[in-house]
């Protein structure tokens, strides 16, 4: 049985990848899933102002859990095995670590359309395609949902 990583960022675009995975399962794919969110690491200002790095870590983890919840709920409702992971750091590097540590065989993730915003946000998906040791399926966001 394949183990597939689905990175999510809380956007409706990320849920497109979950819906694609559900379509594949509906067509007969046997898989279990790891839904992951990578939070940005705290910057120096946040560390100084917070006075307690543990609090920042707890807030970051809670935010990540909130962001993976819809994807986990969709997959669980379909009766699929789902793990959830929240990490902090550089998204591409952390996703590569999650791939390896969880023994994932593939990645399904969304792209963010086109334009300047996509050039920044879509860079994680492009980096994953270039750097991943496993197949990466990119789910394109429909034109009517792409950012301007």
Mark where each language-model region is.
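Intrinsically disordered or low-complexity boundary/linker segments at protein termini
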Residues: 1-19, 131-148
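Acidic, proline/glycine-rich short linear motifs
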Residues: 37-66, 146-148
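Glycine-rich, Arg-bearing micro-motifs that act as flexible, cationic patches
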Residues: 106-131, 145-148
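Short secondary-structure boundary segments
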Residues: 37, 110-112, 141
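Structural beta-alpha unit
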Residues: 73-107, 145-148
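General small-molecule cofactor/ligand-binding pocket signal
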Residues: 34-36, 83-87, 137-139
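Small/aliphatic-rich secondary-structure junction motif
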Residues: 2-51
């Amino acid at each position: 049985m394949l183990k597939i990583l689905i990175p999510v960022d809380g956007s409706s675009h990320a849920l497109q990848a979950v819906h694609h995975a559900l379509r594949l399962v509906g067509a007969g794919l046997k898989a279990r899933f790891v839904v992951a969110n990578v939070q940005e690491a705290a910057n120096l200002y946040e560390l100084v102002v917070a006075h307690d790095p543990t609090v920042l870590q707890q807030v970051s983890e809670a935010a990540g859990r909130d962001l993976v919840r819809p994807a986990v709920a969709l997959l669980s409702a379909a009766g699929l095995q789902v793990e959830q992971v929240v990490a902090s750091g550089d998204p591409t590097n952390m996703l590569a670590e999650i791939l390896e540590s969880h023994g994932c065989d593939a990645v399904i993730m969304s792209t963010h359309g086109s334009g300047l915003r996509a050039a920044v946000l879509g860079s994680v998906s492009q980096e994953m395609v270039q750097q991943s040791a496993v197949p990466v399926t990119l789910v394109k966001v429909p034109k009517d949902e792409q950012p301007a």
